Amino acid sequence: SRSAPFAYALQEADRAGRLRLHVRVDERSAAFLALGMAKLSRRPVPVFTTSGTAVANLYGAVLEASHASVPLIIISADRPPELRGTGANQTTDQVRVFGAAVRMFHELGAPETREGQNAVWRSVVSRMCAAAIGTGGRETGPVHLNVPFREPLVPDLVPEGPWPESLEGRDGGAPWVRVQPSKPQAAGVT
C-alpha cells in the first residue's frame, strides 16, 4: 500500500506511547471517527489514508468538519509526481481534491534522506495544525496534507545508515513555527 510508510511509523509511535492509534479498514469510518474525536476534544485529529479513491472516501467527513468548524487533519499518501497521469494504479488526482472545504492544502515533496528535511516537515506540519485550529484569522476547520512516496514503501531490514541530522526537534523545545493566536470577536461581529 502507498501508505505503508505511515502505517509502520504510526505503529511504532503507538507502541512507544507517543500517540493512540485507531485503525479502521473503511476510510469513511476512519474519517467520521476522527471527526467525532475532534468535535469532542476541539483539538486537531489526523486521519491517515492511502492513495486513490481512499482519499475521496473522506470527503463526507471533510465537508462536515468544514461546516461545523472542526479541526480535522487529512494526511494522504500519494504516488510521486513522475507516476501521475501515466495510468499507474491508484493515481487519482489528490491535489486540492477537497477544494474550498479545507482551510489549507499542502503537498510535500517525496521524502529524501538529506539534511534540512526535518525542518521542512516540522514546519509544514506546524502550519497545518495552526490552520486547522484557526490561527492567523482563519476559521477553524479541516486541512489536507498530501505526501507522495517513492518505493521502497517498507522499511529496509538493513538501514542505509543514520539519518543525517537530529530528529529531536529544536533546543529547549522551541516551536518550529510561531503563530499569533486569533483574537476573539465580539458577539455579532464578523
Residue ranges and their predicted role:
Residues 1-190:
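N-terminal alpha/beta PP-like core and its mobile active-site loop of ThDP/TPP-dependent enzymes
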